[in-house]
């Protein structure tokens, strides 16, 4: 996750309720822990994003305690805005690809989250493919502009 860069539109995020912001962060936290644990680097990442989102320290502790997919599914139901749902799926795909390895657990979680928000699997796959294409394009840019 070291090279991860969040690319969300912060003006858009500012318009979300605190519960919706917390739902985003819970989804990020659970996705980061898909391997069975949250590393210190992943915890720091969640805390930094929470600070950027303006989420209280008290809620951050709640976010970091998530240990099952069902809690995430319930939390994301607070996201009742289609654009916010698609944004969350995009950012989850970016996070899942941050280590260049998309696990089955990550794929299943992204699917469950999307479906809970009313996003069909075809749209989730479309977003995931777009993220992959974009990552490839960024890597090619490093080569072209001799930044390797």
Model-identified regions with their sequence ranges:
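Small-residue-enriched hydrophobic alpha-helices in membranes
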Residues: 1-32, 39-148
């Amino acid at each position: 996750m070291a090279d991860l860069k969040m690319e969300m539109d912060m003006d858009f995020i500012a318009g979300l309720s605190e519960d919706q912001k917390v739902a985003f962060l819970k989804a990020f936290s659970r996705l980061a822990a898909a391997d069975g644990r949250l590393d210190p680097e992943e915890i720091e990442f969640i805390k930094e994003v929470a600070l950027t989102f303006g989420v209280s320290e008290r809620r951050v502790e709640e976010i970091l305690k998530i240990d099952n997919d069902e809690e995430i599914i319930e939390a994301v139901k607070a996201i009742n805005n289609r654009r916010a749902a698609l944004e969350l799926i995009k950012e989850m795909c970016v996070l899942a690809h941050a280590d260049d390895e998309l696990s089955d657990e990550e794929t299943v979680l992204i699917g469950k989250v999307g479906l809970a928000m009313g996003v069909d699997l075809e749209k989730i796959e479309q977003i995931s493919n777009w993220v992959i294409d974009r990552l490839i394009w960024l890597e090619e840019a490093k080569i072209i502009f001799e930044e390797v």
